[in-house]
Amino acid sequence: MAVVEAETRVFLEVRRRLQSALLILGEPDEGGMNLDISVTPTSLLMRSPDGCTEIRLPAGVRLAPSSCGGLQYISGDGLHLRLRAQAESSPQPISGFNQSLQAQECCSFYCQSCGEVTIKDRKLLRVLPLPSENWSALVGEWCCHPDPFANKPLHPRENDCFVGDSFFLVNSRSDLEQEPKANTKVICKRCKVMLGETVSSETTKFYMTEVIVQPSEGSFPNIPRSQFVQSVIARCLVELCTARSTFRFTIQGQDGKVYILLWVLNSDSLVMEPLSSSGCIRKFPLLEDSLEADSGSAWNAIKVLYQPCIKSRNKELASSWEGDISVHPLTLPSTTCLELLLILSRNNASLPLSLRQMNSFQLWCSHCKT
């Protein structure tokens, strides 16, 4: 095929379950030249008067060039092609708190923003998952008998850690000089970021987006903030979709206010976005610090539709979702909710134009570690 392009932005998404691929050859920023594109099972070959560029597909990914269909040109976006594809299955997602690794080990809790130690050398004898936050509502909706555990919170013992959807519960008595009061914020001593809150005089809740839990003999991992928040939320969504067949979520602050509506499209995508005019790999601007330099241009992704709910936007839709038992709430500090909304907006702006919106929702395409 021949098209007129200059610096061609190449975007490839492979859907593992559907065994299909979407290839987008973007429009040049300015000017243009003749460019011949050849698609082989394992690579894309682009020839121009200035030379030839080959983009190799990741190991385990193969295209079927003869299946090319749905060829169309979208103004402002470029040339779209759909092909059959094969890709190896991705590994199962790793739990946000690996129970088999952490139980029986001494761990330390760090503030993710500045590295300040919040809990030092805590030996965890039990690491247990908590029931869904919707559990009481589900019991009331589907069971003919009352919930015997209604309004009875679970409190961890000194060497316990209970894992919720977006938080950890730990016993706080042995780490504080004075007995904490219930319903007060836990603030980092160094950077003053809210890390969690006290549930009772002996239980502290830490939000997963605010703390890093490491074996005590390990060092604090310096992870860029936007990458960390994105990876935690993406991992939570993948785990909940897999375990509970839940695909709609509300992101709400600790004050109960809904900030974002999320609707998971799929988590089986393999995304590749190099730049054809050079040998180096161009990543999404937001993800440049989240992928190792030698990890290649392909990454597992979760695709999520989102709607912001700040400044009274989508108020009726948010109220409808809050009253729907199939919608799962995820609670974060209010400042992190706003931070996440900014991350989603920046990520959306980096996508090809035709992929940024679906009906009234916007698209978030996040790197998902496995």
UniProtKB/Swiss-Prot annotation:
Ubiquitinated by UBCH10 (E2 ubiquitin-conjugating enzyme). E3 ubiquitin-protein ligase which accepts ubiquitin from specific E2 ubiquitin-conjugating enzymes, and transfers it to substrates, generally promoting their degradation by the proteasome. Independently of its E3 ubiquitin-protein ligase activity, acts as an inhibitor of CPSF3 endonuclease activity by blocking CPSF3 active site. The modification N-acetylalanine is found at residue 2. PANTHER family: E3 UBIQUITIN-PROTEIN LIGASE E3D, E3 UBIQUITIN-PROTEIN LIGASE E3D FAMILY MEMBER. Its EC number is 2.3.2.26. It comes from Rattus norvegicus. Pathway: Protein modification; protein ubiquitination. Interacts with UBE2C/UbcH10 (E2 ubiquitin-conjugating enzyme). In vitro, interacts with cyclin-B. GO terms for biological process: proteasome-mediated ubiquitin-dependent protein catabolic process; protein autoubiquitination; protein monoubiquitination; protein polyubiquitination. GO terms for molecular function: cyclin binding; ubiquitin conjugating enzyme binding; ubiquitin protein ligase activity; ubiquitin-like protein conjugating enzyme binding. Zn(2+) binds at residue 144. Residues 332-368 are annotated as: HECT-like. Residues 214-236 are annotated as: Interaction with UBE2C. Keywords: Acetylation, Cytoplasm, Metal-binding, Transferase, Ubl conjugation, Ubl conjugation pathway, Zinc. A motif (BRAT1-like motif) lies at residues 129-159. The C-terminal half (AA 188-389) is able to bind cyclin-B and shows a self-ubiquitination activity (mono-, poly, or multi-ubiquitination) in a HECT-like sequence dependent manner. The BRAT1-like motif mediates inhibition of the endonuclease activity of CPSF3 by forming hyrogen bond and hydrophobic interactions with the active site of CPSF3: Cys-144 coordinates one of the two active site zinc ions of CPSF3. It catalyses: S-ubiquitinyl-[E2 ubiquitin-conjugating enzyme]-L-cysteine + [acceptor protein]-L-lysine = [E2 ubiquitin-conjugating enzyme]-L-cysteine + N(6)-ubiquitinyl-[acceptor protein]-L-lysine. InterPro entries: UBQ-conj_enz_E2-bd_prot (IPR019193). This is E3 ubiquitin-protein ligase E3D. It is found in: Cytoplasm. GO terms for cellular component: cytosol; nucleus; ubiquitin ligase complex.
